[in-house]
């Protein structure tokens, strides 16, 4: 838009621009100064960044129209990790992996202690597990539904996880958080025998006779993200 002569304004809820590139991706995968350099180029092109402003809460789209803004492009991404809908999923020490990454990148969380279990075999699961290692976790175990060779993260990320000392447990689905005094003390799993049905759709099947329990004080789940609209579109 700036290159075509417009003067776009980016409203950012966080204290700095960059979105998931700055707050969701670990520095060992994408250095923050690279993103900051790209943002500086955008500023030179005439893009204005207004940080610490949550549209829908601090200012509405209707109010922005009154201020003279004529067009709106919503690019909030899939920034919510949702909830872990199993018994004990709201215990202390259990949180979405993407929220954990945000805390680390914004320097709200610098260290971890005790044993950590990461749920999810995708790229975010790999990022979260490797970040947990760097935050000082005693041990990190990663569990996923898929078979070892079918993990969505791929061979490269899986190998990087194992080089970092992460133990991969493929073919397991979580059933319950073990809670002691309101805090996470472990996670129970059952064997996953199949992830997709004959039509290729997600329809996991399990063998309830095969189970195991992982001890941990922190459980980080990375099982999909969704849009968190909040009050963004109120009045539109």
Go through each PLM region and give its residues.
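Residue-level detector of alpha-helix initiation sites
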Residues: 16, 122-124
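Glycine-rich FAD pyrophosphate-binding loop
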Residues: 3-22, 140-149
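Short glycine-enriched, charge-decorated loop/helix-capping segments at active-site entrances
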Residues: 24-29
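Short loop/helix-cap segments at secondary-structure boundaries that form the rim of catalytic
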Residues: 83-89
């Amino acid at each position: 838009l700036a290159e075509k002569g417009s003067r776009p304004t980016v409203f950012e809820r966080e204290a700095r621009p960059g979105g998931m590139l700055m707050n969701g991706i670990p520095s060992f995968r994408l250095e923050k100064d690279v993103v900051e350099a790209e943002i500086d180029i955008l500023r030179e092109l005439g893009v204005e960044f207004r940080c610490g402003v949550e549209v829908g809460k601090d200012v509405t789209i209707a109010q922005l129209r009154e201020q003279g803004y004529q067009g709106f492009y919503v690019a909030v991404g899939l920034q919510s990790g949702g909830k872990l809908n199993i018994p004990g999923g709201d215990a202390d020490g259990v949180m979405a992996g993407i929220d954990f990454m945000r805390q680390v990148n914004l320097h709200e969380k610098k260290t971890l202690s005790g044993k950590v279990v990461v749920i999810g075999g995708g790229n975010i699961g790999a990022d979260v597990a490797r970040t947990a290692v760097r935050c000082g976790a005693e041990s990190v175990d990663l569990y996923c539904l898929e078979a070892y060779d079918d993990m969505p993260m791929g061979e490269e990320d899986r190998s990087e996880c194992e080089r970092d000392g992460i133990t991969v447990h493929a073919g397991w689905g979580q059933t319950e958080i073990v809670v002691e005094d309101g805090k996470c003390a472990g996670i129970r799993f059952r064997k996953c025998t199949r992830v997709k049905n004959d039509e290729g759709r997600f329809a996991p099947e399990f063998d309830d006779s095969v189970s195991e329990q992982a001890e941990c004080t922190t459980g980080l789940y990375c099982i999909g993200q969704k849009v968190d609209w909040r009050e963004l579109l109120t009045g539109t």
